[in-house]
UniProtKB/Swiss-Prot annotation:
Keywords: Aminopeptidase, Cytoplasm, Hydrolase, Metal-binding, Metalloprotease, Protease, Zinc
Cofactor annotation remark: Binds 2 Zn(2+) ions per subunit.
Task of the protein: Cleaves the N-terminal amino acid of tripeptides.
PROSITE patterns noted in UniProt: ARGE_DAPE_CPG2_1, ARGE_DAPE_CPG2_2
Residues where Zn(2+) 2 binds: 140, 174, 379
GO cellular component, one term: cytosol
Annotated family: Belongs to the peptidase M20B family.
Protein name, as recorded: Peptidase T
Biological process according to GO: peptide catabolic process; peptide metabolic process; proteolysis
Pfam families in UniProt: M20_dimer, Peptidase_M20
Cofactor: Zn(2+)
EC number of the protein: 3.4.11.4
């Protein structure tokens, strides 16, 4: 599996951070560099129907090597890394045979500590690939890319029986645009798996229902000395709005299947304030109730304002829980779970407290649960991945292809 590590280190050397608020897709030039590199590598491996769309979706096919009516399946990862932490000049550290305790990240004060990240206790003896404390690592989702590419090579080299295997690498997943320009018909798979999860054994087919809430508050500013009965402080109204939002239903207070309201940004002056919330819930009814709650709060706080002052609230749904689509095709999960068990991995079905391209693709007609990559602590300088976890992911991808061929 030396090639697996080589691929991964090659991919993370490219800065592919996506950028929010940009109209073009992909949002950054660095993503194109990785997409063109992957296109070249897929062609060198002999895959067919290798295409790169003008919106940066790369697709290719490993043709079936056995006859029969075997369903075409897909594996998908994204090329961008999170805008939340620098992805420039990533300098990975390789820690072989981890023996426990803190891992120094580079030459500064940053450490990867089992006190803060207890999962490290479960990884003794493994090879960890970490950051140098200055950037993210990019395992999300370049570990997934390296695993898919390596699995393709294994299928070819070991001549493992399989049907048509479709692969796709998408841009701008981290800014919510990855699946918007995905041509499901062109992909032509019966179902697919995103390889974009976390620790070994994770199999995810439930994600949040998600919405964004943008609130515009228009007040009235006058000199504070003569403000009585005239000033309408937009910042005070913003504070009142947030005070009405349930404090125990925030991200830092919730876990598992619990939903939340999250104030992501707030800025303004006396004259004008803007607030941006995200709403998340696994249950569709509770999700709708949360949206109604925000509307009720805005109405309550805005009651009795001068006509020139107002609160404007816009709610936009982002994505929905893919569970309702995936459970219609239980064999997709059955195959993935069997593949894991065949690789001596106990499947861990858990909800995604976030979103994934697979959620949007599932509602576009391509059922698409999420497989693990072996990575942890995404979107920050404490991100790391285990080489053993990546190797297990490759084994599971290969086994899924093999099991699917046996279903003909």
């Amino acid at each position: 599996m030396d090639k697996l590590l080589e691929r991964f280190l090659n991919y993370v050397s490219l800065d592919t951070q996506s950028k929010a608020g940009v109209r073009q897709v992909p949002s950054t030039e660095g993503q194109w560099k990785l997409l063109h590199l992957l296109k070249e590598q897929l062609e060198e491996m002999g895959l067919i129907n290798v295409t790169l769309s003008e919106k940066g979706t790369l697709m290719a096919t490993l043709p079936a090597n056995v006859p029969g009516d075997i369903p075409a399946i897909g594996f998908i990862s994204h090329v961008d890394t999170s805008p939340d932490c620098s992805g420039k000049n990533v300098n990975p550290q390789i820690v072989e045979n981890y023996r426990g305790g803190d891992i120094a990240l580079g030459i500064g004060d940053e450490v990867l500590s089992p006190v803060m990240f207890p999962v490290l206790h479960q990884l003794l003896g493994q090879t960890l690939i970490t950051t140098d404390g200055k950037t993210l690592l990019g395992a999300d989702d370049k570990a997934g890319i390296a695993e898919i590419m390596t699995a393709l090579a294994v299928l070819q080299q070991k001549k493992i029986p399989h049907g048509d295997i479709r692969v796709a690498f998408t841009p701008d997943e981290e800014v919510g645009k990855g699946a918007k320009h995905f041509d499901v018909d062109a992909f032509d798979a019966r179902w697919a798996y995103t390889v974009d999860g976390g620790g070994v054994g994770e199999l995810e087919f439930e994600n949040f229902n998600a919405a964004s809430v943008n609130i515009k508050i228009v007040g009235n500013n006058v000199h504070p000395g003569t403000a009585k009965g005239v000033m309408v402080n937009a910042l005070s109204l913003a504070a009142r709005i947030h005070a009405e939002v349930p404090a125990d239903e925030s991200p830092e207070m919730t876990e598992g299947y619990e939903g939340f309201y999250h104030l992501a940004s707030m800025k303004g002056t006396v004259e004008r304030a803007d607030m941006h919330y995200i709403i998340r819930d696994f249950d569709r009814k509770q999700f709708e109730a949360r949206k109604r709650k925000m509307m009720e709060i805005a109405k309550k706080v805005g009651k009795g304002l001068h006509p020139d002052c107002y609160i404007e609230l816009v709610i936009e749904d982002s994505y929905y829980n893919m569970r309702e689509k995936v459970v219609e095709h239980p064999h997709i999960l059955d195959i993935a779970q069997q593949a894991m068990r065949d690789c001596d991995i106990e499947p861990e079905l858990k909800p995604i407290r976030g979103g994934t391209d697979g959620a949007q693709l599932s509602f576009m007609g391509l059922p698409c649960p999420n497989l693990f990559t072996g990575g942890y602590n995404y979107h920050g300088k404490h991100e790391f991945v285990t080489l053993e976890g990546m190797e297990k992911a490759v084994q599971v991808i290969v086994r899924i292809a093999e099991l699917t061929a046996q279903r003909k």
